[in-house]
Amino acid sequence: PKNLTIFHITGLGAVDKYGLNHLNHSGLVSKVIGGNYGLQIPFMKNLIVGNKIEAYNFPQGILSQMCRTMASKQPGIITKVGLNTYMDPRIEGGKMNKKTKKNLIELIKIGGQEYLFYKAPRPDVAIIRGTSIDNDGYVYMDHEATTREDLSIAQAVHNNGGLVICQFKKFIKKKYTNPHLAKIPSFLIDYYVHDPLQKQTYVTKYDKFRSGERSLKRPKLEKIILDVRKVLARRAALELRRDDVVNLGVGISVGISNIAYEEDIYKDITLTVEAGVIGGIPGSGLNFGTA
């Protein structure tokens, strides 16, 4: 293959030999559409900064919704998200370099009000993963720390006549399994890849607490070192009030979860992260996105 377009929601491949590192070959990638490049591997950043490929940076929430939009064969998403920002085609339209010319976002008017129309791609290959498959090929997420958009991605590619590849860790040998635990039906999947060494996150092999299979009355976390980042996180934590719902992004802000733990106020607030996890103590570093 060559001149591939990569669609990912956030941070696909951050370290070593994982993720997009597999695509580090000359001419293999010509375009990328993503929601986060902060943890992206160097070769992708170099291609973007060097004007070697077309690159778009869209809101993660829009790209997450786009998976369902593509699955239902809708033309795109109409929203006010991004108006008068970097997303607005009157400014930069989410384009990341000079090589990127085509507008994938249009400014439209409905009922006299301005909206942005994010055009839906037509995906033809999906690479997803789960934990287990049963005798019928149904996919289970029993050890996953998050369930992500895997079902919508599989539906989008399948409904577009494409190829769906699913990586999994283990086979379920039981004759009967709880159907409520099956997340992706086998008819959406074309190929399975068995990886018995599949890890839960980049740095965690398997943690039953992150997958929600077990719970602790009080989680055990190491205190983060006292530095400028912690001082900033502590100052932000002073703004928290009982029953607040707090969304934490990757970076300094995720330290607020550690502060909430240290001060024993995490039970009085609800911590969330952009990946969709609600409650608990959000993970930091390469465990970010889990809790």
Task: Place the predicted regions along the sequence by residue.
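Conserved alpha/beta enzyme-core scaffold
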Residues: 1-291
